[in-house]
Amino acid sequence: MQENKMGTMPIDKLIISMSLPIMISMLVQALYNIVDSIFVAQISENALTAVSMAFPIQNLMIAVGVGTAVGVNALLARSLGERDFDKVNKIAENAVFLVLLSYLLFLIIGLFFAEPFFRSQTDIEEIVLYGKQYLTVCCCLSFGCFTQLMFERMLQATGKTVYTMITQTTGAVINIILDPILIFGLFGFPKMGITGAAAATVIGQMIAAVLAVVINQTRNKEIQLSLKGFRPDGTIIGQIYAIGVPSIVMQAIGSVMNYGMNRILISFSSTATAVFGVYFKLQSFVFMPAFGLNNGVIPVMAYNYGAGSRERVVKTLRHTVTYAVCIMAVGLLIFQLFPTQLLKMFSASDTMLSLGVPALRIISLSFILVGFGISCSSIFQALGKAVYSMFVSIARQLVALLPVAYFLAQFGNVNLIWWAFPIAELISIIMTIIFMFRIFRTIVNKIGEKEMV
């Protein structure tokens, strides 16, 4: 079989070839999120607030899907590096089984828990109604989301990230096209309002999922997927989640943080909650390229770890840190210089502008530190120590961010709450550096020693 490029191509070119397609596709995804909220904001500010409040559940959905897929991705890449192709195929088969389990979980959430979730955050009936309509569709038809995420990670694990760009971009473009059509009832379609926004999302996910499955079956020759006579393998599932659970927890913690921040901000006004939701949409346009870089280098590091190439692992990390910090620096400049223009895209009222401009400027001060943290998480995950990333995430969002935000809220000035973000990031970076020293001492510096003996 032909040598995999992850073990031979120069690192700088390899990172670009692996990460750039993912970064582009994730940028398109982020653009969709922004466009989606721009259209929803034209319904009403309460509709925008409802979508903002739905984010914790949507983020939890992504956490389960991406976390499981990250485990599959890293395990596939490591097994490919070890040239254990029988295990590669078994991992892929169990991955499909886990997609089904993930969907069933969120089907239950959509059917029974959408309305109680919104009532736990607000007593404004219009927001509850909008939120229930939106979230029920997103959860009950989420099978496309989980299928897309899993099969895209299979492509990434074998270095075929350009196909991931095709599937993600296709889904996002379909979302963007369908949003105004279904929300406002254009071209003879019924006017569905906020339900139309949700419908556009799931339709895009389903089409992208079908495309990802077809590409895997026709182009991904390193993985031979066949479910004939399949039985779940507890050992492989355990190995997948040994890597994936910390990633799931990390992103799920984001849901807890977001829910907690919504509760804190709604005590000031629904506009403050809408501002926070808009910030998350905007920051995704900065964070997604960094996460795309992260997703691209995880299989590179995992492959070279499995192949015993310490030099390539270290060089990949060094390049990743440099690229991620540069990406976040650009985001910092945009948020500092153009906050008013960014907010006006969402039909921002004068009240929203008065709250949103300082929010964007204060929170974005943490972006450089975030870039370094995202880079370090890639080596934690690739080397099977994703639990380190989980500890850092818990410290940042639960131990630091929410308590500090709650404390600052007691002063009665909503603008003080935004300072909780840079404070929490400082704490998390200290932990990240400690874990980096540990992982180099215990794992990285010992890579390849067996081959030298």
Question: What residue ranges belong to the model's regions?
Answer:
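Helix-terminus/linker motif at the lipid-water interface of multi-pass membrane proteins
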Residues: L27, L31-T49, F118-E125, I181-M192, ...
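Small-residue-rich hydrophobic transmembrane alpha-helices
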Residues: L48-L111, C145-T164, V275-L333, L337-P339, ...
